[in-house]
Amino acid sequence: MTQKTILNDTHRALGAKMVDFGGWDMPIHYGSQIDEHHQVRRDAGMFDVSHMTVVDLHGVRVREFLRYLLANSVDKLKVSGKALYTCMLNPQGGVIDDLIVYFMQEEFFRLVVNAATRDKDLQWIGEQAARFEVRVKERADFAMIAVQGPNARSKVIDLLDPADASAASKLGRFAALQTRTRDGVALFLARTGYTGEDGFEIVLPQADAVAFWNALLAHGVAPAGLGARDTLRLEAGMNLYGQDMDDNVTPYEAALAWTITLDEGRDFIGRSVLESQKAQGAPRQMIGVVMDEKGVLRHGQKVLSAGGEGEILSGTFSPTLGKAIAFARVPAGSIDDLRVDIRGKQVPLRAVKFPFVRDGQAQPGVLGA
């Protein structure tokens, strides 16, 4: 049965076009995906991300457990509220999921994992947690709203209890704090996001979500759907689980080397495979590509390179750039002479560094000569 977030009726009242996303009935747009994309790049937009799964971990050995479970090192998390982006791997080094882990207290960490991988993640985390005597608690009582864009933070801070406004305005990137609204609603406010823009991802009780959403709306934050969320995150060079990596792809093959910490003396699941790939090189690489000819790049299209065949992963038309952009996975080595097969026609591609867009502007080289 399709699941609904607490904001489902609110989306429908706003005229949202609803689609099935990983078993959830979610808004793809509220009239114009392109307008919503530009709204986030230029001002502020908000997304219902209540389909994401919040998992609280409690126990004396919870840090030790996460040192074993995750490819990035939670030893970097020393201050309450600090967050870390990481992959959770299987023994073959494949990505079970990518997630954010928050350090709350020494015996309490919080994970935010993807919606489509919820069942798999909870089973895997539960299996691994047992021998560390860590309690795993899914927080189905929470909703989550992401407010993103250059004016997002100031619009959210205006709605907070004035006593908390200063701390919220000083909150660093990839950090979170417990705060409350002017009406006394408890918020877990994280300076994170999936758009390449500044902003907050806000976890709050489901019972308060509709009123908070409406308060944001009244304060000039426009609703945005999953369509804009996808084009924004791809412009920002951010991976989507299931398209850009999965259980059969290692972080080195998904341009996620920066999320791996091969620190001394820490044995984590999948480490031996990663050490081998680091020493010998991964057989495949993920690159950013731009198509200067008209058309759209789509997941699964065949890519030809000097090193052999690959495929398009995430692909879209970039509203900011006015061109088709994508991630592609191709054999390691040369990325010269790139072409994509579109209905039997070979169309040239340019390999570029990503993010494609930063601070609302094309990155150097992305638009070509």
Swiss-Prot record:
A Pfam family reported for this protein in Swiss-Prot or TrEMBL: GCV_T_C
Catalytic reaction equation(s): N(6)-[(R)-S(8)-aminomethyldihydrolipoyl]-L-lysyl-[protein] + (6S)-5,6,7,8-tetrahydrofolate = N(6)-[(R)-dihydrolipoyl]-L-lysyl-[protein] + (6R)-5,10-methylene-5,6,7,8-tetrahydrofolate + NH4(+)
GO BP: glycine decarboxylation via glycine cleavage system
Keywords linked to the UniProt accession: Aminotransferase, Transferase
InterPro entries listed in its UniProt record: GCS_T, GCS_T_bac, GCST_C, GCV_T_N, GcvT/YgfZ/DmdA, GcvT/YgfZ_C, TrmE/GcvT_dom1
One Gene Ontology term, aspect cellular component: glycine cleavage complex
Superkingdom of the source species: Bacteria
Record-listed E.C. numbers: 2.1.2.10
GO molecular function: aminomethyltransferase activity; transaminase activity
Function: The glycine cleavage system catalyzes the degradation of glycine.
Quaternary organization: The glycine cleavage system is composed of four proteins: P, T, L and H.
NCBIfam families: gcvT (TIGR00528), PRK00389.1 (NF001567)
Family: Belongs to the GcvT family.
Designated name of the protein: Aminomethyltransferase
